[in-house]
A protein has these predicted regions:
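Active-site mouth of glycoside hydrolases
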Residues: 1-113, 120-126
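Substrate-binding clefts and catalytic carboxylate motifs of secreted carbohydrate-active enzymes
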Residues: 86-90, 108, 113-116, 120, ...
Length: 177
């Protein structure tokens, strides 16, 4: 098991511990799929389909900065504190390795004209220049610019304040990328 695979447990735990969209694991599968095997199976099953635009590796991973900015444990108290124990953010080193490994596994089954989508973990500029090597074809960086992040960063909660924040931060960052 490599470091990326062992750290996946940490990432998976965040998504299933009641932070934002918890659920009870009512169904036990005969095996525990890894995220890589799930991505491979998705790419194998749907990768050649005409209507498929692409596959996103993971939606909204919570990086260290976002974990602190959003005060995740306070904002989203765990439904099951025992299960949530030890959950936390993921590092950029982990995400960078995970995305490259996932890309390779998806590309085994999905042609290059389809897109592999990676999420910025709410830190758009941290990905500047990432996966730009010739090997990586049709990689799309997904970014979600939420005003609640602006609020957490001290944006005045008025129309004027939001518009100013959008111009000075979101618009500027997107243009730079």
């Amino acid at each position: 098991m490599n470091e990326t695979e062992s750290q996946w447990d940490k990432l998976l735990k965040i998504k299933t511990t009641g932070r934002d969209d918890s659920h009870a694991d009512q169904y036990r599968y005969p095996y525990e799929p890894t995220p890589y095997s799930v991505l491979e199976r998705l790419a194998e099953r749907y990768g050649e389909r005409k209507g498929l635009w692409g596959i996103e590796v993971i939606n909204e991973p919570v990086t260290e900065n976002m974990w602190e900015t959003m005060k995740v444990p306070e904002r989203y108290p765990a439904v099951d504190p025992e299960l949530a124990e030890g959950s936390g953010s993921v590092t950029f080193d982990f995400l960078r390795g995970f995305y490259k490994d996932a890309y390779d596994r998806i590309r085994k089954y999905m042609p290059e004209e389809k897109y592999v989508v990676i999420h910025d973990g709410f830190e758009l500029k941290a990905w500047k220049g990432y996966m730009q090597e010739e090997k990586y074809k049709n990689v799309v960086l997904d970014t979600h610019q939420y005003l609640m992040v602006a609020e957490a960063n001290g944006c005045e909660q008025t129309m004027e304040g939001y518009l100013k924040y959008i111009r000075e931060h979101f618009q500027k960052d997107i243009q730079e990328m």
